[in-house]
């Protein structure tokens, strides 16, 4: 079964973007490259079990096993030594990427309290969009009763767009609810 967002991209979004930005070739149209989910677990320094819980939650949210990130440098103020595990991240590509974006836009973001749309100022100048989520509970896979601690995560949507304008238009066409 083909993904709904991928089919929409090929049938509707590509022609719309070609018209809007006057591309000479369909290959110039920006597309999603990957979505990176990152969960920093600073309290893993004192209790390694917290990292295991974060890895488990990220696995449920993304559908694939996360990579444990480690400290590059030692920082005495944080009681951190080089090489200590301090977070987890997942790179989503292909079908899983479209599945996750679909779920994010249509299920998870509407579950955020006092949600008025995502910020339009989170583009990085190279066509990538970063979104911070304050609590992992907005995802339907996370069972509220099994959560010991509310954790946030960063979601980076990497596109092949050259400018923020093109990237924003691409995400708007996908249905990303930007704040007015």
UniProtKB/Swiss-Prot annotation:
Pfam family, one: Ribosomal_L5
GO molecular function: rRNA binding; structural constituent of ribosome; tRNA binding
Swiss-Prot/TrEMBL keywords: Ribonucleoprotein, Ribosomal protein, RNA-binding, rRNA-binding, tRNA-binding
Entries under InterPro entries matching the protein: Ribosomal_uL5 (IPR002132), Ribosomal_uL5_bac-type (IPR020930), Ribosomal_uL5_C (IPR031309), Ribosomal_uL5_CS (IPR020929), Ribosomal_uL5_dom_sf (IPR022803), Ribosomal_uL5_N (IPR031310)
S-S bridge residues: none
GO CC aspect terms: ribonucleoprotein complex; ribosome
Gene Ontology BP terms: translation
SUPFAM superfamilies according to UniProt: RL5-like (SSF55282)
Role this protein plays: This is one of the proteins that bind and probably mediate the attachment of the 5S RNA into the large ribosomal subunit, where it forms part of the central protuberance. In the 70S ribosome it contacts protein S13 of the 30S subunit (bridge B1b), connecting the 2 subunits; this bridge is implicated in subunit movement. Contacts the P site tRNA; the 5S rRNA and some of its associated proteins might help stabilize positioning of ribosome-bound tRNAs.
Listed NCBIfam families: PRK00010.1
Subunit structure and binding partners: Part of the 50S ribosomal subunit; part of the 5S rRNA/L5/L18/L25 subcomplex. Contacts the 5S rRNA and the P site tRNA. Forms a bridge to the 30S subunit in the 70S ribosome.
Protein family per UniProt: Belongs to the universal ribosomal protein uL5 family.
Protein name as catalogued: Large ribosomal subunit protein uL5
The organism of origin for this protein: Lactiplantibacillus plantarum (strain ATCC BAA-793 / NCIMB 8826 / WCFS1) (Lactobacillus plantarum)
């Amino acid at each position: 079964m083909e993904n709904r967002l991928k089919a929409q991209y090929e049938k509707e979004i590509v022609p719309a973007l070609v018209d809007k930005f006057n591309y000479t070739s369909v290959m110039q149209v920006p597309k999603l490259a990957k979505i990176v989910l990152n969960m920093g677990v600073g309290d893993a320094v004192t209790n390694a079990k917290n990292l295991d819980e974060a890895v488990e939650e990220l696995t449920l949210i993304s559908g694939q096993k996360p990579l444990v990130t480690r400290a590059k440098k030692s920082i005495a103020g944080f009681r951190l030594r080089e090489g200590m595990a301090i977070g987890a991240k997942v790179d989503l590509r292909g079908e899983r990427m479209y599945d996750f974006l679909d779920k994010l836009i249509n299920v998870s973001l509407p579950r955020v309290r006092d949600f008025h749309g995502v910020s339009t100022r989170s583009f990085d100048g190279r066509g990538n969009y970063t979104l911070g989520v304050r609590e992992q509970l907005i995802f339907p896979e996370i069972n509220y009763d099994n959560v010991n601690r509310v954790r946030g995560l960063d979601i980076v949507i990497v596109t092949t767009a050259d400018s923020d304008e093109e990237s924003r238009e691409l995400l708007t066409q996908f249905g990303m609810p930007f704040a007015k």
